[in-house]
């Protein structure tokens, strides 16, 4: 006699909901992190689109001089941005119900806080969803670990830096030219180009691009021929095939002779781990650098560090960078400062009569 045991299906509405949320058979996996990710990212995206098109000018510096950022107020795709929350609000939590009216909320840049906080929560949940799906499929968790690098970078720019500087008005504007403005001001105030963690980030991003191009070109150049001259080489691969699609020995031999033997990986697994780890670690360091500079632990300062035997300064590139930083800083928020600090130290000429 054969007994057939079947798993008892939950008949409750909550049970069916749980099964649907955690099912890996859905076209798109939702997961418990997705329950929070979907509404937060939809909210951030919707408010961003509406504000980018139609938001009124924002008093970013808190001096009653609003700055326009939306398309309907004279901007284009390049110059448009979501203007950060006003310096008058600082780090205060500023939802719509904290303002006297919607007009006041818009004037003080409330949409920026709403978008940024929902966005950060959403991308963090996306990272958790990657881990959750990997766990349910029996995969290793490194996809979520790799994604933690851009999550850390976004958190550093949109949350940690404003906290360190004391106001959301110091956060990065959500737009193309606003991003460039943020970068220039960051250099002027923190000398980020001379910070070792930023240098590691540059090495990670550009090095990752180089290694990706090298790997892709090596693989493409050492494909195992499965097609004729008149067919695309891509037709020689069938999704899910067990056979190797390229000759790693040939790629290893080529690269080893091009540079030297030990510069080439002979293990496909360690190679792909390296390709993932290099840019991720670099971006981690950049996020850490932004987070330290948020509290004014700035880049190295070698200004006027080289002098001759008479004590006279021999200008170096560090001094050139310093002059550029001063120029950028005095142009920043020029209407907010009656006496820019870099100019206030100059002696005022005495006029007789």
Swiss-Prot record:
InterPro entries linked: D1/D2, Photo_II_D1/D2_sf, Photo_RC_L/M, Photo_RC_L/M_CS, PSII_D1
Record keywords: Acetylation, Calcium, Chlorophyll, Chloroplast, Chromophore, Electron transport, Herbicide resistance, Iron, Magnesium, Manganese, Membrane, Metal-binding, Oxidoreductase, Phosphoprotein, Photosynthesis, Photosystem II, Plastid, Thylakoid, Transmembrane, Transmembrane helix, Transport
Residues holding a quinone: 215, 264-265
Record site: Stabilizes free radical intermediate: 190
UniProt binding sites for chlorophyll a PD1: 198
Gene3D superfamilies linked to this entry: Photosystem II protein D1-like
Biological processes, Gene Ontology terms: photosynthetic electron transport in photosystem II; response to herbicide
Residues noted as binding Fe cation in the record, renumbered to the chain: 215, 272
Cellular component, GO annotation: chloroplast thylakoid membrane; photosystem II
Amino-acid positions noted as binding pheophytin a in the UniProt annotation, renumbered to this chain: 126
Residues with the Phosphothreonine modification: 2
Binding positions (chlorophyll a ChlzD1): 118
Residues reported in the UniProt entry to bind [CaMn4O5] cluster: 170, 189, 332-333, 342, 344
Residues with site note (Tyrosine radical intermediate): 161
Entry note: cofactor: The D1/D2 heterodimer binds P680, chlorophylls that are the primary electron donor of PSII, and subsequent electron acceptors. It shares a non-heme iron and each subunit binds pheophytin, quinone, additional chlorophylls, carotenoids and lipids. D1 provides most of the ligands for the Mn4-Ca-O5 cluster of the oxygen-evolving complex (OEC). There is also a Cl(-1) ion associated with D1 and D2, which is required for oxygen evolution. The PSII complex binds additional chlorophylls, carotenoids and specific lipids.
PTM annotation (N-acetylthreonine): residues: 2
Catalytic activity entry: 2 a plastoquinone + 4 hnu + 2 H2O = 2 a plastoquinol + O2
PTM annotation: Phosphorylated in both bundle sheath and mesophyll cells, phosphorylation increases when cells are grown under high rather than low light regimes (70 vs 900 umol photons/m-2/s). PSII is subject to light-induced damage, in particular to D1. Damaged protein is degraded by Deg1 and FtsH proteases and replaced. In maize mesophyll cells D1 degradation is less extensive in grana (stacked) vs stroma (unstacked) lamellae, in part due to exclusion of FtsH from the grana. D1 degradation is faster in bundle sheath cells.
HAMAP family: PSII_PsbA_D1 (MF_01379)
Further comment: 2 of the reaction center chlorophylls (ChlD1 and ChlD2) are entirely coordinated by water.
NCBIfam families xrefs: psbA (TIGR01151)
Similarity annotation: Belongs to the reaction center PufL/M/PsbA/D family.
Identification of the protein by name: Photosystem II protein D1
Organism whose genome encodes this protein: Zea mays (Maize)
Gene for this chain: psbA
């Amino acid at each position: 006699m054969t007994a057939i045991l079947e798993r008892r299906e939950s008949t409750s509405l909550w049970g069916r909901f749980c099964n649907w949320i955690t099912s890996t058979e859905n076209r798109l996996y939702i997961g418990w992190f997705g329950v929070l990710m979907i509404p937060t990212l939809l909210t951030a995206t919707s408010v961003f689109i509406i504000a980018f098109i139609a938001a009124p000018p924002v008093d970013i510096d808190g001096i009653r001089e609003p700055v326009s950022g939306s398309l309907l107020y004279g901007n284009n795709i390049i110059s448009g941005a979501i203007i950060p929350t006003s310096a008058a609000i600082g780090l205060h939590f500023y939802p719509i119900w904290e303002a006297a009216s919607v007009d006041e909320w818009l004037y003080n840049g409330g949409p920026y806080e709403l978008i940024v906080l929902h966005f950060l929560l959403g991308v963090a949940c996306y990272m958790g969803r990657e881990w959750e799906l990997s766990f349910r499929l029996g995969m290793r968790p490194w996809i979520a670990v790799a994604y933690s690098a851009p999550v850390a970078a976004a958190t550093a720019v949109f949350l940690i830096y404003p906290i360190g500087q004391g106001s959301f008005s110091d956060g990065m504007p959500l737009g193309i030219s606003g991003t460039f403005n943020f970068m220039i001001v960051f250099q002027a105030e923190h000398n980020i180009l001379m910070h070792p963690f930023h240098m590691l980030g540059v090495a990670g991003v550009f090095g990752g691009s180089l290694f990706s191009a090298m790997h892709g070109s090596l693989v493409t150049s050492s494909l195992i021929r499965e097609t004729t001259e008149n067919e695309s080489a891509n037709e020689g691969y069938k999704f899910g095939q067990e056979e190797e699609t390229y000759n790693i020995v040939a790629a290893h031999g080529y690269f080893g002779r091009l540079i030297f033997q030990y510069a080439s990986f002979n293990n496909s697994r360690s190679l792909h781990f390296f390709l993932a780890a290099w840019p991720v670690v670099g971006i981690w360091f950049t996020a850490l650098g932004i987070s330290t500079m948020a509290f004014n632990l700035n880049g190295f300062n070698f200004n006027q560090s080289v002098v001759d035997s008479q004590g006279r300064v021999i200008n170096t590139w560090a001094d050139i960078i310093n002059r550029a930083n001063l120029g950028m800083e005095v142009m920043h928020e020029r209407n907010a400062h009656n006496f820019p600090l870099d100019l206030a130290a100059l002696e005022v000429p005495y006029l007789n009569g």
